[in-house]
């Protein structure tokens, strides 16, 4: 049946980081669509080895480790391994969402707190309810991550530390691939999974995207922050109810089915 492949005949531009884009591509193709991959950003470690002793001391203290992304989890455990550090069993763990929690589980780490809505504001609210006075809250983050948790919790008397584990940089190879793809395909959907991909895309092909939208291309944002980033360039987008890749896919399927009914 046609409904078994709601993205049949649709071309989806995936601007996600290369390491994380494969599953997105597979899901688009399983729904009958064609996915074109252009990795616009990549990541590199930012926390130097010469602070390993301070990290060891922070890990030994009672309190929370807060993971706001899969990248944060990956770079954290890579750092521990390289510096022969161990995550103490007494540490409480908070994760921003399901994917981050699943990645932590791969490292045999269970999550104590996870908000129902996968954004930093909701994670901060959850920590307010579960953290106790005297506990240090240490946030694993990237250089472009917001400091919502610190802003929300410090005024309440919590000690909040931030470890900048990784930094986001443009993927020059992916940017060239984007330029090539723009000349080869017409896109039904352009997907954005972070504000940084929005800014990189708009720097490279901002005017082209406006033309694509005028011709019927729809932009799909993973969540409100990414949506807001597009709005700063005058670009409107559609955002799923659930701020995940699966939510984006469900939204595109729904839009495609609605288009068929018109």
UniProtKB/Swiss-Prot annotation:
EC number(s) of the enzyme? 4.2.1.75
Is Lyase among this UniProt entry's keywords? yes
- Give the matching SUPFAM superfamilies: HemD-like
CDD domains, sorted: HemD
A biological process (GO) annotation for this entry? protoporphyrinogen IX biosynthetic process
Top-rank taxon, per record = Bacteria
Q: Which InterPro entries match?
A: 4pyrrol_syn_uPrphyn_synt_sf, 4pyrrol_synth_uPrphyn_synth, UROS/Hem4
> To which pathway does this protein belong?
Porphyrin-containing compound metabolism; protoporphyrin-IX biosynthesis; coproporphyrinogen-III from 5-aminolevulinate: step 3/4
- What GO MF terms are annotated? uroporphyrinogen-III synthase activity
Q: Does the keyword Lyase apply?
A: yes
Keyword annotations for this protein, in alphabetical order, are:
Lyase, Porphyrin biosynthesis
**What reaction(s) does this enzyme catalyze?**
hydroxymethylbilane = uroporphyrinogen III + H2O
Query: Subunit structure, briefly?
Result: Monomer.
What does the similarity note say?
Belongs to the uroporphyrinogen-III synthase family.
What does this gene product do?
Catalyzes cyclization of the linear tetrapyrrole, hydroxymethylbilane, to the macrocyclic uroporphyrinogen III.
Q: What name appears for this protein in its UniProt entry?
A: Uroporphyrinogen-III synthase
This protein's encoding gene: hemD
């Amino acid at each position: 049946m046609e409904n078994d492949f709601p993205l049949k005949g649709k071309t989806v531009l995936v601007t996600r980081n290369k390491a994380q884009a494969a599953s997105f591509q597979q899901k688009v193709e399983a729904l009958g669509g064609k996915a074109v991959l252009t990795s616009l950003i990549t990541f590199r470690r930012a926390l130097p080895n010469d602070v390993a002793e301070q990290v060891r001391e922070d890990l030994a203290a009672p309190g929370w480790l807060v993971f706001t992304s899969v990248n944060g989890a990956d770079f954290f455990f890579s750092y521990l391994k390289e510096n022969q550090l161990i995550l103490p069993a007494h540490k409480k763990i908070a994760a921003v969402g399901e994917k981050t929690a699943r990645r932590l589980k791969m490292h045999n780490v269970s999550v104590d707190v996870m908000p129902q809505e996968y954004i930093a504001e909701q994670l901060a609210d959850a920590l307010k309810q579960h953290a106790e006075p005297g506990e240090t809250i240490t946030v694993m983050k990237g250089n472009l991550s917001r400091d919502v948790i610190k802003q929300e919790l410090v005024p309440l008397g919590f000690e909040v530390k931030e470890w900048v584990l990784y930094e986001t940089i443009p993927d020059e190879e992916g940017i060239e691939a984007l330029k090539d793809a723009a000349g080869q395909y017409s896109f039904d959907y352009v997907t954005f999974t972070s504000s940084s991909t929005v800014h990189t895309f708009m720097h490279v092909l901002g005017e082209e995207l406006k033309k694509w939208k005028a011709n019927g291309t729809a932009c799909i944002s993973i969540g409100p922050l990414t949506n807001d980033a597009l709005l700063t360039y005058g670009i409107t987008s559609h955002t799923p109810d659930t701020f995940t890749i699966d939510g984006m896919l469900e939204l595109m399927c729904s839009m495609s089915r609605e288009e068929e009914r018109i």
